[in-house]
């Protein structure tokens, strides 16, 4: 992944997230303004009220901000200073890195919106995905081992897709 990238800015995006056309320019503007790391807002490719509600919360820089669906941009130098992703994590790796980012600098949410697939919600239901995410996030917050996080999430969701 990141070790093979050659640019000065790293941009991590899930395969089911569609970047907007202006994302490169938006990243450049954020970096010029002095932000070392951040993400975009997102919306789902679904018009259901509950998914619109989820999307609305991505404008806030709180405890749950910076998860993979929101993407992540970070300067290469800052990424290297932080030691990159913790390779123990194959789930919640984004939240673990963002947690370290927020200890060192302001985390910036670019006020533009990416589109994310709602497939996981269609296959599992909104409530089931929310409860699985909340459960695994709580385990992560209390320091439960990464392999147990992945196992728990796979059990809770029918397709075992990542958070």
Regions found by a protein language model. Give the residues of each.
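Short, conserved alpha-helix that lines the donor NDP-sugar binding/gating region
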Residues: 1-3
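Short aromatic/hydrophobic "clamp" motif used to bind/position activated sugar donors
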Residues: 10
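The conserved acidic donor/metal-binding loop of glycosyltransferases
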Residues: 14-20
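Conserved donor NDP-sugar-binding/catalytic core segment of glycosyltransferases
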Residues: 21-49
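A recurrent flexible, glycine/aromatic-enriched loop bordering the glycosyltransferase active site
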Residues: 37-45, 57-77
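Short, well-ordered alpha-helical scaffold segment located
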Residues: 77-81, 113
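Short active-site alpha-helical segment characteristic of glycosyltransferases
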Residues: 91-103
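Hydrophobic helical membrane-anchoring modules
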Residues: 102-163
């Amino acid at each position: 992944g990141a070790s093979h990238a050659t640019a000065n800015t790293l941009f991590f995006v899930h395969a089911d997230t569609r970047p907007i056309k202006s994302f490169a320019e938006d990243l450049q503007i954020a970096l010029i303004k002095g932000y070392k790391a951040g993400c975009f807002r997102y919306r789902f490719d679904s018009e259901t009220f509950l998914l619109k509600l989820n999307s609305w919360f991505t404008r806030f820089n709180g405890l749950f901000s910076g998860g993979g669906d929101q993407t992540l941009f970070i300067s290469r130098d800052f990424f290297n200073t932080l030691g990159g992703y913790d390779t123990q994590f194959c789930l919640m790796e984004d939240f673990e890195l963002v947690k370290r980012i927020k200890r060192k600098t302001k985390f910036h949410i670019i006020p533009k919106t990416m589109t994310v697939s709602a497939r996981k919600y269609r296959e599992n239901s909104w409530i089931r995905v929310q409860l699985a995410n909340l459960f695994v996030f709580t385990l992560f917050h209390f320091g439960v081992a990464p392999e147990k996080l992945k196992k728990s999430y796979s059990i809770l969701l029918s397709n075992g897709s990542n958070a």
